[in-house]
Regions:
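N-terminal helix-cap/turn-to-beta initiation motif at the start of protein domains
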Residues: 32-49
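Bacterial N-terminal signal peptides
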Residues: 7-15
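Central antiparallel beta-sheet cores of small beta-barrel/beta-sandwich binding domains
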Residues: 50-144
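Boundary at the C-terminal end of the N-terminal hydrophobic targeting segment
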Residues: 17-21
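Low-complexity, intrinsically disordered Gly/Pro/Thr-rich segments
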Residues: 153-167
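Edge beta-strand at a domain terminus
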Residues: 163-183
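Beta-rich strand-turn-strand
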Residues: 142-143, 151-153
Length: 183
Protein backbone atom coordinates (compact mmCIF):
# COMPACT_ATOMS: atom_id res chain seq x y z
CA UNK A 1 0.00 0.00 0.00
CA UNK A 2 2.89 2.35 0.80
CA UNK A 3 4.33 1.73 -2.67
CA UNK A 4 0.95 2.53 -4.24
CA UNK A 5 0.82 5.87 -2.38
CA UNK A 6 4.33 6.74 -3.55
CA UNK A 7 3.47 5.74 -7.11
CA UNK A 8 0.27 7.83 -7.07
CA UNK A 9 2.17 10.81 -5.72
CA UNK A 10 4.77 10.48 -8.49
CA UNK A 11 2.09 10.07 -11.16
CA UNK A 12 0.21 13.13 -9.88
CA UNK A 13 3.45 15.12 -9.81
CA UNK A 14 4.26 14.22 -13.40
CA UNK A 15 0.67 14.53 -14.62
CA UNK A 16 0.00 17.85 -12.95
CA UNK A 17 3.53 19.20 -13.19
CA UNK A 18 3.07 21.77 -15.97
CA UNK A 19 2.72 25.43 -15.08
CA UNK A 20 0.57 27.66 -17.32
CA UNK A 21 -1.24 30.65 -15.81
CA UNK A 22 0.68 33.64 -14.47
CA UNK A 23 -1.07 33.31 -11.12
CA UNK A 24 0.62 29.97 -10.61
CA UNK A 25 4.04 30.42 -12.19
CA UNK A 26 6.67 28.69 -10.13
CA UNK A 27 4.14 27.05 -7.86
CA UNK A 28 4.02 23.27 -8.02
CA UNK A 29 0.88 21.28 -7.55
CA UNK A 30 0.58 18.98 -4.59
CA UNK A 31 -1.74 16.13 -3.64
CA UNK A 32 -5.04 17.29 -2.12
CA UNK A 33 -6.06 16.54 1.45
CA UNK A 34 -9.46 16.27 3.10
CA UNK A 35 -8.76 19.73 4.59
CA UNK A 36 -8.20 21.07 1.06
CA UNK A 37 -11.56 19.62 0.10
CA UNK A 38 -13.28 21.52 2.94
CA UNK A 39 -11.62 24.74 1.68
CA UNK A 40 -12.57 23.91 -1.92
CA UNK A 41 -16.24 23.39 -0.98
CA UNK A 42 -16.33 26.74 0.83
CA UNK A 43 -14.87 28.52 -2.21
CA UNK A 44 -17.19 26.80 -4.71
CA UNK A 45 -20.52 26.86 -2.86
CA UNK A 46 -23.32 29.12 -3.94
CA UNK A 47 -24.98 30.35 -7.13
CA UNK A 48 -22.64 31.59 -9.87
CA UNK A 49 -23.26 33.35 -13.20
CA UNK A 50 -21.02 33.84 -16.22
CA UNK A 51 -21.23 35.16 -19.78
CA UNK A 52 -19.13 32.62 -21.67
CA UNK A 53 -18.51 31.25 -25.14
CA UNK A 54 -18.67 27.70 -23.83
CA UNK A 55 -18.40 25.50 -20.76
CA UNK A 56 -16.62 22.17 -20.41
CA UNK A 57 -19.72 20.34 -19.24
CA UNK A 58 -21.72 20.20 -22.48
CA UNK A 59 -21.49 20.26 -26.26
CA UNK A 60 -21.01 24.04 -26.34
CA UNK A 61 -17.27 23.52 -25.80
CA UNK A 62 -15.39 25.18 -28.63
CA UNK A 63 -18.33 27.45 -29.54
CA UNK A 64 -17.21 30.67 -31.18
CA UNK A 65 -20.63 32.05 -32.17
CA UNK A 66 -21.27 34.30 -29.20
CA UNK A 67 -21.55 34.37 -25.45
CA UNK A 68 -24.27 32.63 -23.46
CA UNK A 69 -25.32 33.17 -19.87
CA UNK A 70 -24.60 30.14 -17.70
CA UNK A 71 -25.58 29.51 -14.10
CA UNK A 72 -23.84 27.13 -11.73
CA UNK A 73 -25.19 26.19 -8.29
CA UNK A 74 -23.01 24.23 -5.85
CA UNK A 75 -24.44 22.95 -2.58
CA UNK A 76 -22.40 21.37 0.21
CA UNK A 77 -24.36 18.24 1.17
CA UNK A 78 -22.06 17.10 3.98
CA UNK A 79 -18.34 16.99 4.76
CA UNK A 80 -17.82 14.41 1.99
CA UNK A 81 -19.98 15.59 -0.89
CA UNK A 82 -21.04 18.64 -2.88
CA UNK A 83 -23.72 18.53 -5.57
CA UNK A 84 -23.88 20.84 -8.55
CA UNK A 85 -26.48 21.95 -11.05
CA UNK A 86 -25.55 23.96 -14.10
CA UNK A 87 -27.71 25.44 -16.83
CA UNK A 88 -27.27 27.65 -19.83
CA UNK A 89 -27.78 27.66 -23.55
CA UNK A 90 -29.71 24.51 -24.46
CA UNK A 91 -28.34 22.22 -21.75
CA UNK A 92 -28.25 21.51 -18.06
CA UNK A 93 -25.82 19.42 -16.02
CA UNK A 94 -25.93 17.54 -12.74
CA UNK A 95 -22.76 16.68 -10.91
CA UNK A 96 -21.21 15.46 -7.71
CA UNK A 97 -17.91 16.56 -6.17
CA UNK A 98 -15.98 14.54 -3.59
CA UNK A 99 -12.53 13.92 -2.15
CA UNK A 100 -10.82 10.78 -3.45
CA UNK A 101 -8.33 9.67 -0.75
CA UNK A 102 -6.61 7.16 -3.05
CA UNK A 103 -5.98 9.65 -5.87
CA UNK A 104 -5.40 12.44 -3.32
CA UNK A 105 -7.51 14.72 -5.49
CA UNK A 106 -10.87 16.44 -5.49
CA UNK A 107 -13.04 14.82 -8.16
CA UNK A 108 -16.07 16.30 -9.92
CA UNK A 109 -18.14 14.11 -12.24
CA UNK A 110 -21.05 15.47 -14.23
CA UNK A 111 -23.54 14.42 -16.88
CA UNK A 112 -25.27 16.98 -19.08
CA UNK A 113 -28.69 16.78 -20.66
CA UNK A 114 -27.06 16.30 -24.08
CA UNK A 115 -25.23 13.18 -22.84
CA UNK A 116 -21.80 14.76 -22.37
CA UNK A 117 -19.92 13.22 -19.43
CA UNK A 118 -17.05 14.99 -17.73
CA UNK A 119 -14.68 14.06 -14.95
CA UNK A 120 -12.37 16.67 -13.46
CA UNK A 121 -9.64 16.26 -10.87
CA UNK A 122 -8.59 19.29 -8.83
CA UNK A 123 -5.35 19.58 -6.87
CA UNK A 124 -3.92 22.59 -5.04
CA UNK A 125 -1.39 24.84 -6.75
CA UNK A 126 -0.31 27.40 -4.20
CA UNK A 127 -3.52 28.87 -2.78
CA UNK A 128 -5.41 28.17 -6.00
CA UNK A 129 -6.24 25.04 -8.02
CA UNK A 130 -5.11 23.09 -11.06
CA UNK A 131 -7.75 21.00 -12.86
CA UNK A 132 -7.53 18.25 -15.45
CA UNK A 133 -10.72 17.23 -17.24
CA UNK A 134 -11.64 14.30 -19.47
CA UNK A 135 -14.82 14.84 -21.47
CA UNK A 136 -16.70 12.09 -23.28
CA UNK A 137 -19.08 13.39 -25.94
CA UNK A 138 -22.30 11.54 -26.83
CA UNK A 139 -20.62 10.22 -30.01
CA UNK A 140 -17.84 8.63 -27.93
CA UNK A 141 -15.15 11.16 -28.78
CA UNK A 142 -12.87 12.20 -25.92
CA UNK A 143 -11.46 15.65 -25.16
CA UNK A 144 -8.77 16.37 -22.57
CA UNK A 145 -8.37 19.80 -20.99
CA UNK A 146 -6.42 21.40 -18.19
CA UNK A 147 -7.33 24.55 -16.34
CA UNK A 148 -6.23 26.95 -13.67
CA UNK A 149 -9.07 27.79 -11.28
CA UNK A 150 -8.45 31.07 -9.49
CA UNK A 151 -10.80 32.00 -6.64
CA UNK A 152 -11.11 35.55 -5.33
CA UNK A 153 -13.42 34.77 -2.43
CA UNK A 154 -13.39 38.33 -1.06
CA UNK A 155 -14.87 39.67 -4.31
CA UNK A 156 -16.96 36.60 -5.20
CA UNK A 157 -15.16 35.98 -8.50
CA UNK A 158 -13.76 32.75 -9.92
CA UNK A 159 -11.61 32.88 -13.05
CA UNK A 160 -11.03 29.68 -14.99
CA UNK A 161 -8.36 29.52 -17.68
CA UNK A 162 -9.12 26.46 -19.81
CA UNK A 163 -6.60 24.95 -22.23
CA UNK A 164 -7.06 22.22 -24.81
CA UNK A 165 -5.63 21.21 -28.15
CA UNK A 166 -7.81 23.61 -30.16
CA UNK A 167 -9.33 20.91 -32.35
CA UNK A 168 -13.01 20.85 -33.27
CA UNK A 169 -15.12 20.53 -30.14
CA UNK A 170 -12.25 21.75 -27.96
CA UNK A 171 -10.57 25.05 -27.19
CA UNK A 172 -7.01 26.29 -27.49
CA UNK A 173 -7.40 28.63 -24.53
CA UNK A 174 -10.49 30.21 -23.04
CA UNK A 175 -11.01 32.38 -19.98
CA UNK A 176 -14.33 32.13 -18.11
CA UNK A 177 -15.07 34.57 -15.30
CA UNK A 178 -17.81 33.51 -12.88
CA UNK A 179 -19.52 35.88 -10.43
CA UNK A 180 -21.06 34.65 -7.20
CA UNK A 181 -24.72 35.65 -6.98
CA UNK A 182 -25.17 34.34 -3.44
CA UNK A 183 -23.83 31.63 -1.13
Amino acid sequence: MKHLSILLTLVLSVTFGSVFADDHKGQPVRPATKEDFARFMKLEQGMWRAEVLSVISDNSLGNKDGKTTYYWHSVRQNSSCMTTLGSGGKNSIRGVTFYDPIAKAIVRTGVSSDGTINKSTHVPRGKQWYRETVITKPDGSVIKLNSDVIHDDANGVTTIIIRGDGTKGSVKEQKNVWYRQHE
